Amino acid sequence: MSQSGKNGLTYSDAGVDIDAGNLLVEKIKPAVRSTRRPGADGEIGGFGGLFDLKAAGFNDPVLVAANDGVGTKLKIAIDADYHDTVGIDLVAMCVNDLVVQGAEPLFFLDYFATGKLDPDQGAAIVGGIAAGCRQAGCALIGGETAEMPGMYSSGDYDLAGFAVGAAERGKLLPSGDIAEGDVILGLASSGVHSNGFSLVRKIVELSGLGWDAPAPFASDKKLGEALLEPTRIYVKPLLKAIRETGAIKALAHITGGGFPENIPRVLPKHLAAEIDLAAVKAPPVFSWLARTGGVETKEMLRTFNCGVGMIAVVASENVAAVSAALEAEGETVVTLGRMIARDEGAAGTVYQGTLAL
């Protein structure tokens, strides 16, 4: 027999608070408005987000799409109760994948799933997403908040992001003229970024340190805060360098898999990247992780960015111009190596020198 009247069940009794969802929408509206750009000036709350490509200034665009998440870095945010920056990570993981194809990020949508919705926590997360969108120059045009009791424990949540960008036809990267002798430039990362955090968490567990302990590699910060340093967003400096110099042949976002998995994705089969490990300036966090976890160099290189979050391939005669354009926008640029001939079946990344950890 079904229940009715004041004894009947409600959605709230099942663990879903519609009022909390509505409150969250009101809390995040100012942050969402702050991401408006040409092509996107609507309000959230409709059934779909709109974007006007003509208003964005494109003539014959090719759309480029990417989606990603933040992985178990979220577990540190949850355990440390620090939610302000994981939204930046979410945006970064998507828009950095767009810019490596020469695309300008246009708009972003997020998916936020939780066991029990906390409007203040949700507003902090979406505030970070909006901050990432502002850094990337893309509009946050919509999203989905899913309260799912029974699927997630109270306090737990997961994030997914979806970004769409565009490039004029014929301007996509990588270009078809990558050649032996071309130079590989590395752009410094801000830290661990958003990959390898299952290993990071295992190492922290072995260390016996709590998230509130001073970070051994950054004594002015707590361990949780230091590890949650957001992923660097390279979009605006790279787009400016691409447009000003016209000399960037390829870009690779150094995420899970490190150099050996990510650099070959943008290279022709007959070329390999020769990396001088002595040129890699690994921040102290990586030395601490390697030392504390007894992680071998090979494993570090295929798990973490080790201090290089993005690489660019340019002809040797254009190194100075591209480096100057990037450095003018605040990037730290190092010469990492060069393109060499690659035999059939050989590795797409080879190393010289030693990584200082």
From Swiss-Prot:
Compartments, as annotated in UniProt: Cytoplasm
Major location category of this protein: cytoplasm
BP terms from Gene Ontology: 'de novo' IMP biosynthetic process; adenine biosynthetic process
Domain of life: Bacteria
EC numbers, comma separated: 6.3.3.1
Catalytic activity, reaction form: 2-formamido-N(1)-(5-O-phospho-beta-D-ribosyl)acetamidine + ATP = 5-amino-1-(5-phospho-beta-D-ribosyl)imidazole + ADP + phosphate + H(+)
InterPro entries cross-referenced by the UniProt entry: PurM-like_C_dom, PurM-like_C_sf, PurM-like_N, PurM-like_N_sf, PurM_cligase
UniProt entry tagged with the keyword Zinc: no
Molecular functions per Gene Ontology: ATP binding; phosphoribosylamine-glycine ligase activity; phosphoribosylformylglycinamidine cyclo-ligase activity
Gene Ontology CC terms, in alphabetical order: cytosol
Biological pathway: Purine metabolism; IMP biosynthesis via de novo pathway; 5-amino-1-(5-phospho-D-ribosyl)imidazole from N(2)-formyl-N(1)-(5-phospho-D-ribosyl)glycinamide: step 2/2
Keywords: ATP-binding, Cytoplasm, Ligase, Nucleotide-binding, Purine biosynthesis
Keyword Cytoplasm: yes
Pfam families according to UniProt: AIRS, AIRS_C
Similarity comment text for this entry: Belongs to the AIR synthase family.
Protein's UniProt name: Phosphoribosylformylglycinamidine cyclo-ligase
